[in-house]
């Protein structure tokens, strides 16, 4: 016998579904909403984004340093071009800790007095140690590096995948096509020209390209890399898992400080790659990189 649900329960279910839809889409639409209002966002964080100290909206059309001064107590050096302290957290030469600023995920290649904030920009000031990692870009502010770019310039996006990761690649493609120009190709169809001139999201584990990128992990400032079947961190600890890490493209002829196109690598064991992708697409990134796995 078929039973009808009470009207009240149906209404509650509909409301829950609508709330869920709103939460999924609101973050993706946030860039456009902020841009429409002529606003930008400043985030102040510690230790590669692990602790957020402040997150506030600011006006666009002003320099990064002026925006920072409007929301925090700032001490400067070298003629006002170098930030040495934010809210009483100071540079530490002995411990090799300093403040670095990123725009939509890119480590800026100009001083904070020289970058003029555009509507929709996300500017992050992060205090971290540079002794072991020189990080040229950060993933925590995904997807702004693709949707906003640096200095208001974006590049077409290509999602590239090894056959094992086709489903995850299609999920990313369907997510990103809502806001950027994007194509999807199998790794065997990837050309050098694509790598040099586009943003690339690469999903893989065993291809020569993945191996090549992994071999440069130290140069790229990555905390994790693949070694055979394992993910290895900068301390040599091994995991069975997968990671997502980002870099300014090493295939750009101008180098990894050009602030032009981005390469995002999602790599590792098959059972963990899907989890990493879900973390990205659901905005659950809690540091400059994502790693999911079990320590060995």
Over which residues does each language-model region extend?
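Secretory targeting signatures
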Residues: 1-33, 201
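Eukaryote-biased recognition of intrinsically disordered, low-complexity regulatory segments
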Residues: 33-57, 142-155
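Extracytoplasmic
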Residues: 37-39, 51-53, 62, 96, ...
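Solvent-exposed alpha-helical segments and adjacent loops
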Residues: 119-296
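Residue-level recognition of short, solvent-exposed, well-ordered loop/turn junctions
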Residues: 59, 118-119
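Hydrophobic, secondary-structure "cap" segments at the distal end of domains
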Residues: 65-115
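Short, solvent-exposed loop/turn motifs
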Residues: 50, 107-108, 238, 295
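Surface-exposed patches in mature extracellular/periplasmic domains of secreted proteins
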Residues: 54, 74-84, 182-191, 289
